[in-house]
Design a protein with these regions (language model features):
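C-terminal interaction-tip segments
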Residues: 1-27, 148-177, 244-257
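Extracellular and analogous surface-interaction loops
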Residues: 37-48, 146-152, 195-200
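Extended extracellular/luminal ectodomain segments enriched in beta-structured repeat modules
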Residues: 44-53, 66-68, 156
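Extended, low-complexity, turn-rich repeat/linker tracts enriched in Gly/Pro/Ser/Thr and Asp/Glu
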Residues: 58-68, 167-172
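Short coil-to-beta strand junction motifs in C2/discoidin
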Residues: 65-72, 247
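Short edge-strand/loop segments of extracellular domains
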Residues: 72-84
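Extended, solvent-exposed segments with strong compositional bias
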Residues: 94-149
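Autoprocessing Asn-cyclization modules and mimics
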Residues: 171-246
């Protein structure tokens, strides 16, 4: 924290690969009002804060731009040391119960802010807000107060964020293992040869990746358009396995103390 402003850094919520694609590589698109990711905890300095900006980076689809749809970020806090109950399964509409009393507010990300973006990743920047009643405004005045003594270290409290899509999105990658001899499991650094979509348009260093059948791979340490270097390969892979990241969405929130 520096001065009266601080941000979360880029948070990497988990969207399980099993909820992004069918294990035979068939696409498994998210529909309007589906859960993108369930509650992710982060810590903020103790006290009351105003949310001043929210940013999302979306992975594209098959190396191309992601569908430009509105998104919502739901913010919540713990009560009596209990985290907000799960919203449900990603890629399905909200089915969980008991989370309403934990809610702090809703941030609405307007897709029009993404128009003309030339980045290989889809970036959304917006300060449009929605209060708990759901009416949109542009004041940027969502104020949150976390639950006291709920953080992981002294002087910090815990807040939770979850994501909801307001339109169809698809995180299948079409990045395919291109090794006729397949790939064995290894505990050492290895480089995977890939084809299909350019790996550099889908992934970035630091991403944790898996195959479409949930075969665990590892963390990306280097990339080219046709190769992915990882710190290890936890499970054996087969030629033409589709590779996905466990965090296709990244979120950054900034606050005024």
């Amino acid at each position: 924290m520096k001065g009266k402003y601080f941000d979360t850094g880029w948070l990497k919520p988990i969207t399980p690969v099993t909820n992004q694609i069918v294990n035979d590589k068939s696409d498994l698109a998210f529909a309007d009002k589906d859960i993108l990711f369930d509650w992710l905890a982060f810590d903020v300095p103790r006290g009351t804060h105003k949310l001043v900006s929210a940013s999302l980076i979306h992975q594209g689809n098959h190396g191309a731009r992601q569908a430009e749809t509105d998104q919502q970020l739901w913010l919540a806090r713990s009560i009596d040391g209990v985290a907000p109950p799960s919203l449900g399964t990603p890629n399905v509409a909200v089915s969980g119960t008991g989370h309403r009393k934990h809610m702090l507010g809703i941030v609405h990300i307007d897709q029009t802010q993404a128009t003309g973006d030339l980045s290989p990743f889809n970036q959304f920047y917006s300060t449009a807000m929605a209060g708990s009643a759901g009416s949109l405004n542009n004041s940027g005045s969502l104020v949150i107060e976390s639950a006291p003594n709920s953080g992981s270290s002294a002087g910090f409290d815990r807040v939770y964020v979850a994501g909801i899509t307001m339109g169809a999105v698809n995180f299948s990658t079409n990045v395919l293992l291109n090794q006729a001899g397949n790939q064995g499991a290894t505990t050492t650094t290895t480089t995977l040869t890939v084809n299909g979509a350019a790996a550099t348009k889908v992934f970035e260093v630091g991403d944790v990746i898996q195959a479409m059948d949930l075969a665990a791979i590892g963390t990306i340490t280097a990339l080219t358009t046709t190769s992915i270097t990882v710190d290890l390969c936890e499970a054996a892979l087969e030629d033409d396995d589709e590779i996905l990241t466990t965090s296709p969405i990244k979120v950054k929130l900034a606050f005024e103390a």
